[in-house]
Amino acid sequence: MFDKNVLKGKRILVTGGGSGLGKEMTRHFVKYGAEVYICGRRENVLKDAADEIMSEHGGKVNYFPLDIRDAMSIEENIENVFNEGPLDGLVNNAAGNFISRTKDLSPNGFNAIASIVFHGTFYITNAVGKRWLELGHKGSIVSILATWVWTGSPFVVPSAMSKSGINAMTKSLAVEWGPHGIRLNS
């Protein structure tokens, strides 16, 4: 369908890239020539994913453990990545969720999801975006949402609220950063 080198020379970061949707996106980015960075909380999962994908397709999959709730750690890791050269793409895929009746949610339960999905996505988007702005580098950001952004859903209020916030962030930054060649979609 695509030329096997359509992404050659592109550098892409996938959060939550060690499993599930993030791993599959990474697999296809590498298949089409991109150098990919994956991050997540479980280093052994990241290593296994990187090794598996490179054994299938060659290419280069770099990984680093990262708790996306930690803004300072994000800044340090993104700085390290950019020291090797600027990224061209960011996929905001890291997420967390659990099912709970809203009336039973504790503040800690709510914050556990909001810290990953809402805050973490903003922290990493801003860390990458501000470097692109400083360098005058064009880039693309894709943020993964869920259908309940539009439809609502019971028992997932922290995730629905957080994903809705990401949708608003995406639209707002598309207008703010678009004139600088930074494209955002969700």
Regions picked out by a protein language model, each given a short descriptive name:
Residues 130, 175-179:
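Alpha-helical segment proximal to the catalytic Tyr-Lys
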Residues 146:
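Residue(s) in the substrate-gating loop at a strand-loop-helix junction
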Residues 2, 105, 152-160, 172:
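Active-site loop-to-helix junction immediately N-terminal to the catalytic Tyr of the SDR YXXXK motif
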Residues 125, 162, 170:
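Active-site helix of classical SDR
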Residues 18-20:
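Conserved glycine-rich cofactor-binding loop
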Residues 34-48:
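Conserved glycine-rich Rossmann-like NAD(P)H-binding loop of the short-chain dehydrogenase/reductase
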Residues 101-102, 106-114:
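Substrate-binding pocket helix/loop in short-chain dehydrogenase/reductase
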